[in-house]
Structures are given as structure tokens and as C-alpha cells.
């Protein structure tokens, strides 16, 4: 399913398509190495050569939680150094990328990829539980409950403050 030549696809949209295809093909994977995204993009362009800007878009221009330089898309999210996934609503991002494009418009990509836009909307909506599970602050919820397991919180504070005068 090579990217059709009748639509001059933007490099950022090409990166999004390649990453979305990886997510759809590997639903149990949460993210991908930069090189995996590059290989998938190369596979999609088939007979023509991959444009030189694709790499810098995967590394920087499309990455929501990196400072814009100069591209300010929010199409990818850096989960760890060298790893990316598609950006999701609720992900943190650099404030300078506020309001930036997160998903290609249908008319900007070949018709054979339009189903990816629908797939993404469903994928983005369904995974609220994973986002909560992976949030570092929310992960702390309940982490200290064993401290007060056999003592009321007010009694614990009172005991700590004994002899402060």
C-alpha cells in the first residue's frame, strides 16, 4: 500500500501515516524506535526515494514534547530517548506547540490512508486507562497507604507532632 503520487503528501503527514501503520500493525506495542518508523516510511514510499526531511520530522519537528525547531507539529510523542508513538489527547507537550496540527486532514493524504484517520480517533479515545496508568503523578496514588494502615491519619500527625514545643 504505497503512498500514492496523486496527492503531494507533506513530510509530517508521511511520518504520521508510517507511525499510525506501525501502531495498527502492532497493537500490543506502545511505542517504536526512530529507526522502525523510518523503515516503515521507506516501505510506504515504495518506488520513490524517501525524502531527506522525514528523519528530522521523526526526531524533532513532529514531536510534541520537544521544543519546536522550527516545525511545531504535535503528531508524535517521545516516550523515551529514541522512541516515539502517536500523540494522544492528554499528552504533555511544549507550550510553544499549542494549537499545532496533531493529525492529517483527509484531503492532505491519499484516499487509501483515510481509514487511518478513523482508526486513530478510535485508538485515541479508547486508551484513557493506559494514559492514567502511565502518568507518573497518578501512579503515586495509594503508594503510602501502608503507612497508615493501622492508624488514622489524624492520630499519625498528632503522634509526629508530640514534643515539638
Residue ranges of predicted features:
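DNA-recognition alpha helix
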Residues: 18-22, 33-46
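Alpha-helix C-capping/helix-to-loop hinge sites
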Residues: 21-26, 44, 143-147
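Charge-rich, solvent-exposed alpha-helical interaction surfaces
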Residues: 40, 119, 156-159
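Phospho-regulated, low-complexity intrinsically disordered regions of nuclear gene-regulatory
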Residues: 2-22, 52-139
Amino acid at each position: 500500500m504505497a503512498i500514492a503520487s496523486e496527492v503531494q503528501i507533506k513530510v509530517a503527514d508521511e511520518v504520521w501515516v508510517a507511525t499510525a501503520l506501525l501502531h495498527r500493525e502492532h497493537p500490543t506495542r506502545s511505542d517504536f524506535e526512530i529507526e522502525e518508523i523510518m523503515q516503515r516510511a521507506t516501505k510506504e514510499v515504495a518506488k520513490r526515494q524517501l525524502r531527506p526531511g522525514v528523519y528530522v520530522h521523526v526526531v524533532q519537528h513532529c514531536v510534541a514534547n520537544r521544543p519546536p525547531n522550527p516545525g511545531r507539529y504535535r503528531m508524535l510523542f517521545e516516550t523515551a530517548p529514541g522512541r516515539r508513538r502517536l500523540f494522544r489527547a492528554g499528552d504533555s507537550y511544549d507550550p510553544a506547540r499549542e494549537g499545532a496540527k496533531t493529525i492529517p486532514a483527509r484531503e492532505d493524504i491519499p484516499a487509501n490512508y483515510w481509514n487511518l484517520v478513523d482508526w486513530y480517533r478510535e485508538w485515541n479515545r479508547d486508551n484513557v486507562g493506559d494514559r492514567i496508568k502511565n502518568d507518573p503523578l497518578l501512579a503515586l496514588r495509594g503508594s503510602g497507604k501502608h503507612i497508615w494502615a493501622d492508624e488514622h491519619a489524624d492520630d499519625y500527625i498528632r503522634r509526629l507532632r508530640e514534643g515539638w514545643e
